[in-house]
Amino acid sequence: EALLKAGALQTAIFNSANFSSIATDAKGVMQIFNVGAERMLGYAAADVVNKITPADISDPEELIARAKALSAELCTSIAPGFEALVFKASRGIEDIYELTYIRKDGSRFPAVVSVTALRDAQNVIIGYLLIGTDNTARKQAEEALLKAGALQRAIFNSANFSSIATDAKGVIQIFNGGAERMLGYAAADVVNKITPAD
């Protein structure tokens, strides 16, 4: 009974609509494409299983860049394509990375992908499991924070008041645009260099 429950739990986790679960054979051809992958990518499993690799639904420019970066990092030649997606996992190295997936309709979205090599009893790789999550909301939140920070800096630096802040020793750490205009010093000339008394 415990094994049946464990099997049911594994099935429920694997079929979660919140994660794309893509299992491939050793050559990278998709063998399993779960409900979450169907929802995120717009393909039916029948459209991709035994037909394409995860590289075919990934941004080709990112695959080239990833292959170059991994080749430099690991001092070996790594081909763009599926090999770039699974190279670390094939060597037993934990691999979680950001990647742009391409949906069936051609639209793109950022994903965080975790890759694991699947091995048989003799420790021979028989395939790979790629678990992905849609990273769109986090990316949008990061962009909103960057824009908010830029807006705050713009307001702070265009203010008609001077704002000067020092550290515990009295050395200037903040010197805004208003202070530059009123006092005639550039921030670069005073920050981390002098105290207001100087």
Locations of regions flagged by a protein language model:
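Intrinsically disordered, low-complexity segments enriched in polar/charged residues with Gly/Pro
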Residues: 1, 8-11, 85-88, 104-105, ...
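Active-site-proximal helix/loop capping residues that flank conserved catalytic or ligand/cofactor
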Residues: 1, 15, 55-56, 83, ...
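PAS-associated C-terminal cap
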Residues: 1-7, 121-124, 133-149
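PAS-family sensory domains
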Residues: 5-20, 39, 144-158
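PAS/LOV-family and closely related PAS-like sensory domains
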Residues: 18-130, 164-198
